[in-house]
Regions:
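ER/Golgi luminal nucleotide-sugar-dependent glycosyltransferases, focusing on the catalytic module
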Residues: 2-412
């Protein structure tokens, strides 16, 4: 039995709930439409990267991605790692199994149709492999992905680590990769930095010995790869397509862009060698948004690998000593070549007395310099074991103690 007129509150509540339900489904539907290019397949694949502004087409390169700084794990934590390696059937990876057995490998044997990991076409050198891995594993990435070549020793590996790729893997500081997002594992600037590719360079100024790829780097190519993006005055980044990237940084780049890059590789009429070289000088742009990306060499060695000389000037002093030593070795090598040629001809080398003195002096000087350089490197490694020393040579935007480095009384 009703004791009075119906209460107004329940009706208002029901109306509110119905309105909320309608709003919810309308919101989900409209959001889904704006993200139609983001194909579901996992919980992550349905989300937009935080670097992409709401309502922006992932392939609109005129609007830069907003990359965010990463955070290293707490001290003592482990990082998951995978090494992506392109190779041919003739290349041997036994050195990786021997020297870095702890590192999981994802191998792409590009000329083997029965290989476990496949690329759509053997084209574009390592770029096709790198892009295919990212596309295929976008939702299942380790903390750090290290993209590397198959050979252990190469001129483009780090000089202070014996040009040894195994040391790159074993000494790599994953905290640095997590913090920066992207790290070229080569520290030396040349070739590629600080001022390398110019898309408006006059034809008569091309350097076909040091930069054979520059003639292919024209405005039209940039616009094909990054439609809508401003033409940069220079593209400069450390060679040679070996780098580490964090999971978060890869996922801050929309998946559609990696698919777009690979499609360009598949369809371009450019020679295979140079289409791969095109990407060699834009990996840093893809993962940082910077056309020019040339981290300080001493910082790369110190924070990246624990080889700390105590600042840029001391690092530069070491490099100069090393260059001087190498110049003397080149001088001595000319004498050695003459001796080898004479031996092949069954003769005694016809060195003058003055030349013999020069050779002895060079051998002695080189020996002394080698011992000095060895000690400097050993001291640098010991310094790198000290977290405070490493912090002294690590990039930072923190200015809280910056005036501690100014000459006394110069603070303004």
């Amino acid at each position: 039995m009703l004791s009075g007129p119906p209460r107004l509150v329940p009706f208002i509540f029901v109306a509110f709930v119905l309105a909320l339900v309608v709003w919810y489904y309308h919101g989900v539907s409209s959001t889904g439409a704006s993200l139609s290019t983001w194909k579901p397949g996992s919980s992550f694949a349905t989300q937009r990267p935080a670097s992409l502004r709401p309502g922006v087409d992932p392939l609109d390169f005129s609007i830069p991605l907003r990359f965010s700084d990463g955070q290293p794990k707490p001290a003592g934590s482990n990082y998951t790692l995978k090494i992506v390696v392109p190779k041919t059937t003739k290349e041997d990876l036994a050195w990786m199994q021997e020297e870095i057995p702890h590192a999981p490998l994802v191998v792409y044997e590009v000329d083997n149709e029965k290989a476990e990991n496949k690329v759509p076409k053997n084209k574009g050198r390592e770029a096709m492999v790198y892009l295919s891995y990212i596309i295929d594993h976008y939702d299942d990435l380790p903390d750090t992905t290290l993209f590397m070549h198959a050979h252990r020793h190469a001129w483009h590996n780090n000089q202070l680590m014996g040009l040894d790729a195994a040391q790159i893997v074993n000494r790599l500081n994953h905290d640095r990769v997590a913090r920066l997002g992207y790290m070229n594992v080569r520290c030396h600037h040349d070739p590629g930095c600080p001022d390398w590719i110019h898309m408006d360079r006059p034809g008569g100024d091309f350097d076909f010995f040091h930069k054979p790829e520059e003639i292919y780097w024209r405005k039209s190519i940039w616009e094909e790869i990054h439609p809508g993006a401003p033409i940069p005055p220079s593209i400069s980044g450390i060679c040679c397509a070996q780098f580490a990237v964090s999971r978060d940084r890869i996922r801050q780049v929309p998946l559609e862009r990696f698919i777009h890059y690979r499609k360009w590789l598949l369809t371009t009429g450019m020679d295979d060698q140079f289409s791969g070289r095109i990407f060699e000088y834009i990996w840093h742009y893809i993962f940082t948004g910077h056309e020019v990306y040339c981290p300080a060499m001493n910082t790369c060695y110190c924070d990246g690998y624990g080889i700390c000389f105590g600042g840029r000037q001391k690092f530069d002093d070491y490099i100069k000593k090393q260059d001087d030593r190498n110049a003397k070795w080149t001088q001595l090598d000319e004498f050695n070549k003459r001796a080898d040629k004479a031996k092949e001809e069954g003769k005694e080398p016809d060195f003058t007395d003055a030349e013999k003195v020069t050779m002895d002096t060079l051998r002695s000087t080189i020996g002394d310099m080698d011992r000095e350089l060895d000690k400097l490197r050993e001291d640098a490694r010991k310094r790198g074991d000290d977290p405070k020393m490493r912090a002294e040579e690590t990039e930072t935007y923190d200015s809280s103690h910056i005036w501690d480095y100014a000459p006394h009384g110069d603070k303004i």
